[in-house]
């Protein structure tokens, strides 16, 4: 057991006050030196690290806000582009309808013009046919009348007489 006391450096009932004071003094000097040499720089490094982390958090927050603002701007621009595209499509539809109406109106007018032209041409051809038939009837009537009467009257007198008769017949209708 004696050996245990030697190893530990103390006796069982004996306190060495000088050793206690020396140990305490060395501890305090060592703490002072650690504070000056190690604790100050260590705390400075920790402070710098804390500031770096805070600035990175602040930068990340700023970037998040900027990206959110950019996203909102992009949404706004997209909405504006969609609205503009919709108005262009609607304008094109209206323009298409107007052009369709103009084309239909022009086609109807052309059809009416062609119809009226055809009716005038038909009327003209009808008048020509009636005049030709009249001339033929007059010629045949003169020929028939001259054969019936066996005498020949002047063709001009006979034609005038027949035209007068046909005109009276036309008025009677």
UniProtKB/Swiss-Prot annotation:
This is ATP synthase subunit b. F(1)F(0) ATP synthase produces ATP from ADP in the presence of a proton or sodium gradient. F-type ATPases consist of two structural domains, F(1) containing the extramembraneous catalytic core and F(0) containing the membrane proton channel, linked together by a central stalk and a peripheral stalk. During catalysis, ATP synthesis in the catalytic domain of F(1) is coupled via a rotary mechanism of the central stalk subunits to proton translocation. Component of the F(0) channel, it forms part of the peripheral stalk, linking F(1) to F(0). It is found in: Cell membrane. Pfam families: ATP-synt_B. The keyword Cell membrane applies. GO terms for cellular component: plasma membrane; proton-transporting ATP synthase complex. Belongs to the ATPase B chain family. InterPro entries: ATP_synth_B-like_membr_sf (IPR028987), ATP_synth_b/b'su_bac/chlpt (IPR002146), ATP_synth_F0_bsu_bac (IPR005864), ATP_synthase_B_chain (IPR050059). It is a single-pass membrane protein. Its main location: membrane. It comes from Lysinibacillus sphaericus (strain C3-41).
């Amino acid at each position: 057991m004696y050996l245990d006391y030697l190893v530990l450096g103390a006796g069982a009932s004996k306190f060495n006050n000088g050793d206690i004071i020396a140990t305490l003094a060395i501890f305090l000097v060592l703490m002072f030196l650690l504070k000056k040499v190690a604790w100050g720089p260590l705390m400075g490094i920790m402070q710098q690290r804390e500031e770096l982390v805070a600035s990175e958090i602040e930068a990340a927050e700023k970037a998040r806000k900027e990206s959110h603002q950019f996203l909102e701007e992009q949404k706004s621009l997209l909405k504006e582009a969609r609205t503009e595209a919709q108005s262009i499509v609607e304008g094109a539809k209206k323009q298409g309808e107007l052009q369709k109406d103009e084309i239909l109106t022009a086609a109807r007018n052309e059809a009416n013009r062609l119809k009226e032209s055809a009716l005038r041409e038909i009327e003209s051809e009808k008048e020509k046919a009636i005049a030709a038939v009249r001339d033929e009837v007059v010629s045949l009537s003169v020929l028939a009348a001259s054969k019936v009467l066996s005498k020949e009257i002047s063709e001009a007198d006979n034609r005038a007489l027949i035209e007068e008769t046909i005109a009276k017949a036309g008025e009677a209708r």
